[in-house]
Amino acid sequence: LKCNKLVPLFYKTCP
């Protein structure tokens, strides 16, 4: 998944 700082669920995908 792409880095998504707007969605806590996807926030973990951010470096």
From Swiss-Prot:
UniProt main location, coarse: secreted
Binding partners and assembly: Monomer in solution; Homodimer and oligomer in the presence of negatively charged lipids forming a pore with a size ranging between 20 and 30 Angstroms.
Entry keyword Ubl conjugation: no
GO molecular function, one term: toxin activity
Ion transport recorded as keyword: no
Functional description taken from the UniProt entry: Shows cytolytic activity on many different cells by forming pore in lipid membranes. In vivo, increases heart rate or kills the animal by cardiac arrest. In addition, it binds to heparin with high affinity, interacts with Kv channel-interacting protein 1 (KCNIP1) in a calcium-independent manner, and binds to integrin alpha-V/beta-3 (ITGAV/ITGB3) with moderate affinity.
Tissue specificity: Expressed by the venom gland.
Keywords of this entry: Cardiotoxin, Cytolysis, Disulfide bond, Membrane, Secreted, Target cell membrane, Target membrane, Toxin
Localization: Secreted; Target cell membrane
Record-level GO cellular component terms: extracellular region; membrane; other organism cell membrane
Protein name: Cytotoxin 1f
